[in-house]
Amino acid sequence: MEKKLFNGARHLLPVSERQSLEKGLVKMKAKREGKIPALVTAWPKFNDAFCDGLEWRTITVVGARPGTGKTLFMEQVVSDIIEKNPDQKFRVLKFQMEMVDETSAIRKFGLITGADYNTLMSKDGKLVDKKLFEKCVEYYKSTINNDLINVIYDTCTVSEMCATIHYELERYKNEDGTYPNMLVTIDHSALFKNDIGQKDKFEMLGALGEALTYMKKNYPVAFVVLSQLNRNIDDTKRQVEANYGNYVLDSDIYGSDALLQHADVVIGINKPSIRKIKKYGP
């Protein structure tokens, strides 16, 4: 019986580096001519982390402490991108596995109106103002002409996520048969179910990182992934004012070894006032 070399693995097809250089020149020229604009947001520092805004075929990981409004941040980013980039054609696919759909919608209305969840839900018998409610109704009506966002609320595996992204790209193909650009947001990374053969969340996160990299290389997508933080962020030593430990570090992000090696940009969200830190960082 003939022994198979390298366990019978298929060989990969190398690409000439010269071809890569040519592609680089084409991209530089297109950027110079304004043919591949980035997605601008309302935050200059966020835009500066990329090249004038969120770029296609990138992975952005956002680590945040509980209570810092990470879901609100995600909603704001998506709303900003749609509002500030009207000349760009793209779709949005959200994996919102933490909330039920109506709760997510009410938080969206809160973002649009500036009212908090309790106000919109008439807490303690204080009925929501009629004008405020009508503003929510008007926003709902306006989305009929700008229905760019689809949402997945069901918990799924990483493989199911990839299959869903592919399905959506096929569903909304351009007239010339090409795929549209798609912004994919994930809230949050640890909520994916373990797939077959995955023993724990860390193996799942490793698979997620590999899947995100595969998808960005093969499809016109950009990912923004929310991640929870490890508990060491709450160590009392890190609550001392004017200390380097006040900052969110790469190592604070849950499953950082598995996920961050695939990220193009990493952002930390903090709210020092929660820990009564008056002077933040050295």
Sequence positions of predicted segments:
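Helical hairpin unit composed of two closely spaced alpha helices linked by a short loop
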Residues: 167, 180-215, 222
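Structural motif
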Residues: 61, 151, 183-187, 224, ...
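Cytosolic-facing regulatory segments adjacent to core modules
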Residues: 41, 48-49, 84-180
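The Walker A/P-loop phosphate-binding site
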Residues: 7-115
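Phosphate-binding/switch region of NTP-binding enzymes
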Residues: 107, 208-282
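Flexible beta-alpha connector loops of hexameric P-loop NTPases
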Residues: 120-125, 194-204, 238-249
